[in-house]
Amino acid sequence: MLNSLTTFSLFPLAELEVGKHFYWELGGLKVHGQVLMTSWFVIAVLVLASILATRNVQRVPGGFQNFMEYALEFIRDLAKNQLGEKEYRPWVPFIGTLFLFIFIANWSGALVPWKIIGLPEGELAAPTNDINTTVALALLTSLAYFYAGFKKRGIGYLKKYLEPTPILLPINILEDFTKPLSLSFRLFGNILADELVVGVLVFLVPLIIPLPLMALGLFASAIQALIFATLAAAYIAEAMEGHH
């Protein structure tokens, strides 16, 4: 029995390290190496899924092609519901990329045994467990809705800051700063909290007991991806329509 416990302890599934990072030096800048590694993993999964789904396209889809077409239809409907029939098509790739990246990134934190991969410092985790990732995604969303607004309305897009009255100019400007903040911190907080809670429970009690909470975490992670993509589409639609 003691030998079994010793063997099990070789795999630090519940070891928690908060605030430590594995840094890479790139051009004189320090970047979080573990975030780049897990992000590349997520991107590789998405690229591989795309290749498998389009390698031998059939008129009557089946298997993995059928699953990917269902995912594409779901993303298309999401964009259509938020942006409308006339405007949604150019934005399907952007909204879909956001949703799929966040979805796979969130689930990788629960399904991939990152803890057994040792690093000199810090530990591997879901990319969305790092505030830098969520802020980057939120800033991309901000750039997207500014681009959509200026492309659709030209310089007239700036009139939105004076609506419905010029007195609200400071509040309207502040709103553009709070949107990416709320997007990034909501996603970061939910994913970090989920991984910390599951990690503590696995550390304190047997593996079987935290399983229901892990399942709930997978569901919540999927919902967070949906919320982020839906809000991104809604912000883009708002920028093009010119009203709140």
Swiss-Prot record:
SUPFAM superfamilies, sorted: F1F0 ATP synthase subunit A (SSF81336)
Write the gene name: atpB1
Q: Which organism is this protein's natural source?
A: Picosynechococcus sp. (strain ATCC 27264 / PCC 7002 / PR-6) (Agmenellum quadruplicatum)
Q: What does this protein do?
A: Key component of the proton channel; it plays a direct role in the translocation of protons across the membrane.
Its predominant location is membrane
HAMAP family recorded: ATP_synth_a_bact (MF_01393)
Under the subunit heading, UniProt states: F-type ATPases have 2 components, CF(1) - the catalytic core - and CF(0) - the membrane proton channel. CF(1) has five subunits: alpha(3), beta(3), gamma(1), delta(1), epsilon(1). CF(0) has four main subunits: a, b, b' and c.
Output the Pfam families linked to this UniProt entry.
Answer: ATP-synt_A (PF00119)
Q: Does the keyword Transmembrane apply?
A: yes
Instruction: Report how it sits in the membrane.
Output: Multi-pass membrane protein
Q: Give the source's domain of life in one word.
A: Bacteria
Name by which UniProt lists this protein: ATP synthase subunit a 1
Q: Which GO terms describe its cellular component?
A: plasma membrane-derived thylakoid membrane; proton-transporting ATP synthase complex
- Protein localization: Cellular thylakoid membrane
- Which is one GO molecular function term here? proton-transporting ATP synthase activity, rotational mechanism
- InterPro entries from the entry? ATP_syn_F0_a_bact/chloroplast, ATP_synth_F0_asu, ATP_synth_F0_asu_AS, F0_ATP_A_sf
User: Does the UniProt entry include the keyword Transferase?
Assistant: no
Gene3D superfamilies linked to this entry: ATP synthase, F0 complex, subunit A
As for family, the record states: Belongs to the ATPase A chain family.
Q: Which UniProt keywords apply?
A: ATP synthesis, CF(0), Hydrogen ion transport, Ion transport, Membrane, Thylakoid, Transmembrane, Transmembrane helix, Transport
So where does this one cross the membrane? Answer: 33-53, 92-112, 130-150, 196-216, 217-237
